[in-house]
Swiss-Prot record:
The gene is folE. Keywords: GTP-binding, Hydrolase, Metal-binding, Nucleotide-binding, One-carbon metabolism, Zinc. This is GTP cyclohydrolase 1. One of its GO terms (molecular function) is GTP cyclohydrolase I activity. Gene3D superfamilies: 1.10.286.10, 3.30.1130.10. It comes from Sulfurihydrogenibium sp. (strain YO3AOP1). The lineage of its organism: Bacteria, Pseudomonadati, Aquificota, Aquificia, Aquificales.
Length: 187
């Protein structure tokens, strides 16, 4: 997707005027450019090469990367939601570098969306690229659209999950994953 920085700048200028602000005042003068640059940066996360290693007969146990910090925007109010993603897969002859898991989370996070779709997109992408025996994604997030407006409940955490393959079919595998991602939490 191509970012149209001029349209973003115009829209932000109109938005500021719409809420009664002067887009030419000192603190806001460069805001339209800053916002356009921010979206350009977000767009750069979408481009990534998934380096995959063929590991015939090698590691076939669960790989978990937990507590991946992520930031996204609620598509309904354009307010941030943020939290932690926990991602696992069980290799079937293919593995990827651990940093690629974080990059996949970033790839899908930096855009307006709902958490449910974000969770599913991460799992589906890993399923397609790695062709593993299973993928598990759990995301925990605070939604500012619920904290700052509406119900105004800043303490609530939304948890979504997407499980495929052995994580979905085998209770022991699912329990192992959940134990691994929760083992560090205080009781």
């Amino acid at each position: 997707m191509v970012i149209d920085k001029n349209k973003i700048e115009q829209a932000i200028r109109l938005f500021l005027e719409g809420i009664g602000e002067d887009p030419n005042r000192e603190g806001l003068r460069d805001t339209p450019k800053r916002v356009a640059k921010m979206w350009e940066e977000f767009e750069s996360y979408r481009e990534m090469n998934m380096t995959i290693f063929e590991e015939v007969g090698s590691y076939d146990e669960m790989v978990v990367v937990r507590d991946i910090q992520f930031y996204s925007l609620c598509e309904h109010h354009l307010l941030p939601f943020f939290g932690k993603a926990h991602v696992a897969y069980i290799p079937d002859k293919k593995v990827c570098g651990l940093s690629k898991i974080v990059r996949v989370v970033n790839k899908f996070s930096y855009r307006p969306q709902v958490q449910e779709r974000l969770t599913a997109e991460i799992a589906e992408y890993l399923e397609k690229e790695l062709q593993p025996k299973g993928v598990a994604v759990v995301m925990e997030a605070v939604h500012l659209c619920m904290a700052m407006r509406g119900v105004r409940n800043p303490e609530s955490i939304t948890v979504t999950s997407k499980l495929t393959g052995r994580f979905l079919e085998c209770q022991k595998t699912r329990e192992e994953f959940l134990n691994l991602i929760n083992s560090h939490k205080k009781m």
